[in-house]
Amino acid sequence: FGVLAKGPVVLLHLLPVAALAPWWRPGLPWKRWAGGVLLAVLGGAAIALAWAIPAAIQGGEEYARMIFWGQTAGRVADSFAHKRPFWWYLPLLPVLLFPWLLWPGLWRRLLALKREGLDGGLRFCLAWLLPVFAVFSLISGKQIHYLVPLFPAFALFAGRLLAGGMRFDVRTVATPAA
């Protein structure tokens, strides 16, 4: 459904996590995993093309150019709408991550990662968050809601961090908004 709704950009939320699976899940049978990912991508492409090709034929040359280039790759290099600099998302992060950024326990646990290291769950979240954020920052067209699919990854990351150091102290687990 994602490819039909938003085009191939939805793959940015899936492929980095899939490609980085050996990092977040050591011991994973890589050939089987990669084969499954390839099969899923090809299946999704077949479903999307089953709609896009007849639509392009019916809509004519200009419509075909817009759905296959203008609405996808054309937005990456030279957006016709919402063109913003690569750093545009950075000043918005404090607002997007409020009130989590005010949570002292989260910061303590983040600092503790230097000595404890990253487990598979944290690596999974980072494999989802960081590449997608970096790629969306490089794409010329930017809208704040493009980052909404990253919120679950951040929530999982924050939850895993906090659960790793849980002492059931009200100061650690109480939200800043409370």
Where are these regions (language model features)?
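Transmembrane-lumen/periplasm boundary regions of multi-pass, lipid-linked membrane glycan transferases
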Residues: 10-144, 153-164, 173-178
